[in-house]
Amino acid sequence: MTLSTSSIQTPAVLAVMATAVAFGGCGSSGDSMSTRAASGASAATSPASAEGPWSPPPIDPANFVSRVDNPYLPLAPGTTLRYRGVMKDGVTPQVDSFAITRQRKIVMGVTCTVVRDTVTSRGRPVERTYDWFAQDRQGNVWYFGEETQELKHGRFGKMIDSGPAGRNGAQPGLMMEADPMQGDSYWQFHWPGHAMDTTTVLGSGGRVELPYRSFKDTLLTQEQSPLEPGVKDQKWSVRGIGYVQEGAASGTHEQIKLVSVTHH
């Protein structure tokens, strides 16, 4: 997987997903926690609750802004976050480079920030996606899908248009709320049979010790997908930085931690 949402399950990437884990979205949602719509979002732009019947969120391009400066998921172009950890087997090393580019992608009429997310292991490429994010006027960060770069003969090749929202039944969802509150539960992305990720806000994640530095206050979320029963994934976020740590709560042994933040 990659740091954004879980890699969308197309035939071209299924083999890669068997080993790659990084900061992907298809993690885990909490067990039977209370839900509400995206905090601060109007009824017209709130995604459906992760519980109950699915209803696609109406998207109004006029309700989106050009920047992504949500405190818990700031995406400043030129910033690269680097993570180290292990893959699903708990042994194989991996490095994830989460690079916020200056590129833009139009999806469903919304101008999205493009993030290049690359996973390597022992110096060899494993997976690369280009993920699309946009922030609404209320401060919620939305996920609009991704492109996957084909891995062939040990090198990244052509792009595979593997999951833009608004096509083939795929719908966007939230990556981070403007005002996360304990018990909130929402869809990250909804594409039946390919990506059906949900997030639940667990509350404070407490103190974390990382190679990059230690943080006293963190936000803890948990993700899951019906496409991966039994797999639960937790993420720790820090204001002003974004995701700093991810670890499997059940189903696998994946783990990844922030080691550096650079700006250029």
Where are the model-predicted features located?
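C-terminal motif of bacterial Sec signal peptides marking the signal peptidase cleavage site
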Residues: 22-25
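Bacterial N-terminal signal peptides that target proteins for export
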Residues: 2-13
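Conserved functional acidic sites
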Residues: 34-264
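Absolute N-terminal positional cue centered near the fourth residue
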Residues: 4-5, 20, 36
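Short, conserved catalytic or interaction motifs in soluble domains
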Residues: 28
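Hydrophobic helical h-region of N-terminal Sec-dependent signal peptides
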Residues: 13-19
